[in-house]
Amino acid sequence: MNDYCINKYYINNYHIKKAFNKRALMQDLIKKAGQVKLLVMDVDGILSNGQIIYDANGIETKAFSVQDGVGVKSLARYGILTAIITGRSSPMVDKRAAEMGVNHIVQGRDDKLIALNELLATLDPALNITAADCAYMGDDLPDIKAMQTVGFAATVPNAHAEVIKRSHMVTTRAGGTGAVREICDLILKGHGHYQDFIASYTLDEAKTQDNLSWILVF
């Protein structure tokens, strides 16, 4: 009985510490996200699932997440810039970027770090955006140098192991399935805009609580 109590205590203590550490880590990530002025995204493996599909005519197609699009637009709503830096070139990327309202698009660049530095050099100096003010989402080796330079580096669970090792955060969702949205939400939280953004899509919950309670009881 005593052994059981001791073991139970240690098990509970372990879970408490684990929960505390997880919360502390999340608070640190939110703090980092709160410094972000520009979100830079790779395309293949981040905005898409990394697969390249060719039709019978050899035309390349990609699939993108609608939820990611909402996330990118949410950043623009609060004055946070977005950019795409990708090694491949595709008219579909231009089209999707335009739909999402991405501010800067750089395609066909293998050296992502040079591309990032060149992009930063073109920004209005009044914005005062440096690499330390950027978040970068990448998933493979060409992204690492740029990710090591920025203030907040994020990747996806199926990224290359070397990328994961050098990332501040690994999203729950894979590329092309809402991973970018996770980072966008985190950036909104860091800047204190998340609740305001959610409130713009919801009714006054105090007025709808009675109906919700009735549904749950029923």
Describe each model-derived feature in a short phrase:
Residues 8-13, 18-19, 50, 74, ...:
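A ubiquitous, low-specificity "background" feature that marks scattered single residues
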Residues 1-41, 193, 197-218:
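Non-catalytic pre-domain segments flanking phosphatase-related domains
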Residues 58-62, 98-100, 104-109, 113-218:
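Mg2+-dependent phosphoryl-transfer enzymes with acidic/Ser/Thr/Gly-rich catalytic loops
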Residues 20-114:
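Alpha-helical substrate-recognition element adjacent to the catalytic core
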